[in-house]
Design a protein with these regions (language model features):
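Bacterial N-terminal signal peptides
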Residues: 1-9
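N-terminal activation segment of mature serine protease catalytic domains
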Residues: 10-44, 48-52, 58-61, 65, ...
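Flexible, gly/ser-rich surface segments that form the specificity/activation loops bordering the active-site cleft
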Residues: 17-21, 111, 119-123, 131-170, ...
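C-terminal recognition in membrane/secretory proteostasis and scaffolding
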Residues: 20, 48, 66, 89, ...
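Active-site region of chymotrypsin-like
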Residues: 28, 40, 46, 105-120, ...
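Short conserved beta-strand and strand-loop elements enriched in small hydrophobics
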Residues: 32, 74-82, 133-137, 313-321, ...
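Conserved active-site neighborhood of the chymotrypsin/trypsin-like protease fold
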Residues: 37-38, 55-145, 184, 208, ...
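Short, conserved beta-turn/loop elements at beta-strand boundaries and strand-helix junctions
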Residues: 58, 93-97, 154-160, 246-248, ...
Length: 438
């Protein structure tokens, strides 16, 4: 009888500790309202979005999704667990992992006497399918909503996907899959275990399906959070190869199982292309570190192995091509998104985006000068001149557009004193001269 009493006492104490941990977690979950500048319509406009986040330190550091705060937030307000609203600023943003960090206005927090409760990370590496988890957030504006489910998969892989605004995400991590309900507004909120430890950051649901939600593992979030707080960005190296899983191809390439990874494509003009790598090569090792990409879930660690090297460093890629194995020295560049800086040239009725190096390579452009037209206002001078969405603006008044500042200055001059402006454009590889008239 005494043993039973002891066991019951231990169980009650454990449940109480778990309850305290979960209640503390609830105090750390916040709602995020963002007002963001957008340029897609050929003019400046403001959009509003709502998401969730979680306080990760008592000095006001909030972890959320990159797609919640966007790239051009002009106002961020965070609603705390006490329902009070506090201003915040963007500290850092990493669309590659869909994570962002905010910092609360701590002067305001202290002036108003608020006490902040910080959440703690759990070990996502130790999760197992069937384990109970909870998603906490603000679905459809309903604050501090808790939904319960299980871990459906601990290592879900998605091929490189395009997020909101066309930004790439998913190259450098796998995802936790859960059947806990994740709806619009949950994004950025924590996925937690029963003791309130954060094991993931809710990121997306699966359109048209039920009980399919996905979260960024804490193992990824912990590293990105630290880098964003310290440096404001996560800088990664790039060589220009896209790895592909070798599953079912080993016999074709006469390879032993679990040997190497397929080079499925090579970006034109990239360091790998300049070094001589080709699609169909088998990458065996990177600086002597053996790689194994038999399954898609094994690809993110290979991407991270390259991304973690210093920019400008030389990598030795050991490659099998046919019966021959040889080493290729490849010098890394800084990884860059295909989505460049955006701006609105309102008097002309044009929204533009800087041509990035990645965009230029994808579209086989000769260089990375220029700006892509992403929006045109009907009836405005740009539209009347014949400029269309998707055109690339190469020169303005015979000056190469090597940055958006060139276009901004020409537009400012037009705004101050309207005069005909000569624009050199490219459409389907055909270059034309157009005149924007007042």
């Amino acid at each position: 009888m005494g043993l039973v009493a002891v066991l019951i006492g231990v169980n009650v104490e454990a449940r109480a500790a778990m309850s305290r941990g979960f209640n503390r977690l609830l105090e750390s979950v916040v709602s995020i309202n963002v007002r963001e500048l957008a340029f897609e319509s050929g003019a400046r406009r403001y959009t509003s979005s709502l998401g969730s986040g979680v306080l990760m330190s008592e000095d006001g550091v909030v972890l959320t999704n990159a797609h919640v705060v966007g790239r051009r937030a002009v106002e961020i307000n965070v609603t705390l667990s006490n329902l009070e609203r506090v201003g915040a600023r963007l500290v850092g943003w990493d669309h590659w992992t869909d994570l962002a960090v905010l910092r609360l206005d701590m002067d305001e927090v202290k002036r108003r006497g608020f006490k902040l409760a910080a959440a703690r990370f759990g070990e996502s590496e130790k999760l197992f399918p069937g384990q109970e988890v909870y998603a906490v957030g603000t679905p459809h504006g309903l604050t501090r909503t808790v939904t319960r489910g299980i871990v459906s998969n601990t290592n879900r892989y998605f091929e490189d996907t395009r997020g909101i605004g066309g930004y790439e995400t998913g190259m450098f991590n796998t995802w936790l899959q859960t059947d806990a309900a994740i709806n619009p507004g949950n994004s950025g909120g924590p996925l937690v275990t029963s003791d309130g430890k954060v094991v993931g950051i809710s990121s997306r649901g699966y359109l048209g399906a039920n009980n399919l939600g996905f979260a960024i593992p804490a193992s990824t979030a912990r590293v990105v959070l630290e880098r964003l707080v310290q440096e404001g960005a996560v800088v990664r190296s790039y060589v220009g190869i896209v790895p592909g899983a070798l599953q079912d191809l080993e016999n074709f390439y006469a390879l032993a199982l679990n040997t190497g990874v397929l080079v499925s494509s090579v970006d034109p003009g990239s360091p790998a292309a300049k070094a001589g790598l080709r699609p169909g090569d088998i990458l065996l090792s990177i600086d002597g570190a053996r790689v194994d990409g038999r399954f898609p879930e094994q690809l993110p660690p290979i991407q991270n192995l390259i991304a973690s090297r210093p920019i400008g460093s030389e990598l030795r890629l050991s490659v099998k091509r046919g019966a021959e194995t040889r080493d290729f020295p490849v010098v890394t560049e800084r990884l860059e998104s295909r989505v460049g800086e955006e701006w609105a040239l309102e008097k002309w009725g044009l929204s533009v985006r800087r041509v990035s190096r990645t965009y230029a390579r994808e579209n086989q452009l000769e260089g990375s000068d220029g700006a892509v037209v992403i929006g045109v206002q009907p009836g405005f001078p740009g539209d009347v001149a014949g400029i269309a969405r998707g055109d690339i603006l190469l020169k303005v008044n015979q000056q190469s557009i090597n940055s958006l500042d060139v276009l901004k200055q020409a537009h400012a001059a037009y705004e101050a004193s309207p005069a005909p402006t000569l624009i050199e454009t490219q459409r389907n590889r055909r270059v034309s001269l157009l005149i924007i008239k007042p």
